[in-house]
Amino acid sequence: MKAAVCRRYGPPSVITIEDRPEPLPGRGEVLIAIESAGLTSADARIRAARAPAGFAPFIRLAFGLTGPRRPVLGREYAGRVVALGDGVSRFRLGDEVFGITDGMRLGAHAERVAVRADGLIRTRPDGMIVPEAAAFFFGGLTAADFLLDQCKLQPGERLLVVGATGAVGSAAVQIAHHQGAHVTALASKANLELARKLGSDEALDYRLDAAIGAFDVILDVPGVLPNALARLAPGGRLGLVTASLGQLLGAMIRPRRDSDRRISANVIKETPEAMARLIALYTAGAYRPLLAESFSLAEIVRAHAAADSGHKVGNVTIRMPKIQ
């Protein structure tokens, strides 16, 4: 099978297309012929061994010292079940599925991937197109976890989303709008109209630093908003999606020191329940993954460059060769 392989950390050009053995599904696993895969900011960070301040050593400890131990990156996928391991009854051959690879196994940037049948895999809902399915979970699960679980966003509260048209921010604007919050979006000038279409009540150019007033919740996706705590109303909550080690430690300490304003920077929950909630939001018309550029597997170096640009709108997806 063809796969995108990362054998050493570095710029997008370190990714090569190679022929690799097709995986065999073990007991309790299914083999997926991938039609499309998401290429997320997390994939780009792993490829470059790039992390928020203070976390760089941990990336190499977790994934490999000089290059990823599992050289085929990618976690989000959409495809079709083409083989069943022993003991699998939940799926049948030909089922159209989407999901997230198991734990740190990665492997979705390839024509085939084997995953646990009882893991983070679901049958694709009627009407959901393949690119949506491939880009469904990364931004959506992150946004829902921060807004609904960590920051406890309530109807009528004022929310500021920093980075409102990326994968996470675009999902957050939609989910918060559905939740009945008043949403202010910070984005580039070129993306203000898009932010409004996603459901924001106000859309402001982040370069002007015009987000004034007291917000009940701030979701800072890139972790760059100056004086964020000072912009919170009493009892306000700050969600830091991309947090430095110092910010994470602060989030752990501050609730004990200051019950008035809180910082949340916890790892999100990837559970069947979280997936089901996001699918329910999709079914209710409250969430659609924002699709950006789509690249063929052969163009994956360009896809990584797009993810690295810092100006990515929505989700980048990878198209696989036609399923045989």
Predicted regions and their residues:
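Glycine-rich beta-strand-centered segment in the early N-terminal region that forms part
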Residues: 21-38, 52-103
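C-terminal capping/lid region of NAD(P)-dependent oxidoreductase domains
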Residues: 286-290, 304-324
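Glycine-rich phosphate-binding loop and adjacent beta-alpha segment
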Residues: 224-287, 320-324
